[in-house]
């Protein structure tokens, strides 16, 4: 099973999950059908975590890979908030903009990034994406009862932080180490984690899974064991039912069937499906709830 096929399975799982949320919100499906669709969706994140580690091992440009994840974290945040309007009833007021309680951490990032950009020998425009993503993470924007930006953060924040952590850990284990650079990266990771971990989709549990899979990267059986243990821990913590546990544990199938081949490249399409489908579902939620 190639990376292409595994990605398609994860995407289909995610789409079924989110579609189930919308259809149940509209009372178009029964509670049993909703439970099945949500259970299918539990397959997606552990597979994404596996793909992040696999992508890190195969990429020739970690910075570009990380920047892409951060960029889509920023791009996806408004669609993600619109989609989650189905869970909120907000007062029908005018424009409201608030800063989260940890906005000062974001301000530090913006200042440091600005100084780094202006003092660089060659301007690096990729710094815009982490600044934008972290700024959106601390903003809450509502307009006439519609949440445009909320406190909950989309899964790209978790995936990006997980990738950044394993990149720093990998650099720290090499023979040639730049300790000053590693210290700065560690501080940046701590700040980003402090800023987003409480609100990001899957949060600390998701980042921990990515790191654990990377540590076990040389053994498919160890990776499978970690994924199984993660599903058990998640089941014990949240207790969402056996069907969702089974949906999650099915992630072991592509891990064992992975043949190491890339397959047909999806390029940016793999990432774009996430904000596009959330934007469509979010628009439908807003339309049916407020129009």
Which stretches of residues belong to each language-model region?
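Alpha-helical transmembrane segments and their immediate juxtamembrane cytosolic regions
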Residues: 1-291
């Amino acid at each position: 099973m190639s990376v292409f096929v595994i990605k398609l399975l994860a995407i289909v799982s995610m789409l079924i999950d989110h579609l189930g949320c919308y259809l149940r919100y509209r009372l178009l499906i029964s509670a049993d059908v909703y439970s099945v669709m949500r259970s299918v969706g539990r397959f997606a994140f552990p597979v994404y975590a596996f793909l992040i580690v696999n992508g890190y091992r195969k990429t020739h440009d970690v910075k570009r890979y990380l920047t892409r994840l951060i960029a889509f974290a920023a791009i996806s945040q408004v669609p993600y908030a619109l989609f989650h309007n189905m869970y909120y009833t907000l007062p029908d007021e005018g424009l409201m903009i608030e800063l989260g309680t940890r906005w000062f951490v974001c301000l530090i990032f913006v200042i440091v990034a600005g100084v780094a950009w202006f003092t660089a020998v060659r301007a690096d425009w990729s710094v815009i994406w982490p600044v934008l993503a972290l700024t959106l993470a601390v903003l809450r924007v509502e307009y006439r009862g519609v949440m445009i930006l909320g406190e909950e953060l989309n899964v790209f924040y978790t995936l990006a932080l997980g990738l950044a952590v394993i990149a720093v850990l990998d650099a720290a284990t090499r023979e040639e180490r730049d300790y000053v650079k590693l210290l700065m990266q560690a501080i940046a990771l701590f700040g980003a984690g402090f800023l987003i971990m409480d609100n990001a989709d899957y949060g600390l549990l998701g980042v921990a899974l990515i790191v654990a899979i990377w540590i076990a990267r040389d053994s498919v059986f160890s990776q499978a064991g970690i994924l199984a243990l993660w599903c058990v821990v998640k089941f014990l913590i949240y207790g969402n039912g056996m069907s969702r546990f089974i949906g999650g544990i099915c992630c072991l199938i592509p891990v064992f069937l992975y043949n190491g081949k890339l397959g047909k490249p999806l390029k940016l399409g793999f990432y774009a499906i996430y904000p596009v489908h959330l934007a469509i579902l979010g628009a439908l939620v807003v339309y049916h709830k407020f129009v």
